[in-house]
Amino acid sequence: MLNIFKIKGDSMVPTIMSGSYVFTCYLNDYDIGNLIVLRISEKMHIVKRITAKNDGKYQIVGDNKNTSSSFCDYTYSNEAIIGRVIFIFNPVWKFSKFVRSIKNLLRYEKNYGSRNN
């Protein structure tokens, strides 16, 4: 099953920025290095990276070395995992490309004007 989550917070920077969306897919087994979304409570989900796997339990960590999370002090079973992150969409990246293209277009128009005149 495919799920989509909006990310809030900086624990996964620079891999995932706050405001990004992650798409996840449930698997029966996960590997070290996978990015996963975990269900902490009914209304709380977190995204972290798997760093160790032992007896069906997973140890996790955030990618941001400047932050820490108490959630990383525990191990989690498959039942807590909603899915592996398969795609990250960052609207800010797309918007910055859009702004850059508009600036380039305006610069071109200013320098060269319309060729139809």
Predicted segments, located by residue:
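Extended hydrophobic leader/signal-anchor segments used for secretion and membrane insertion
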Residues: 1-117
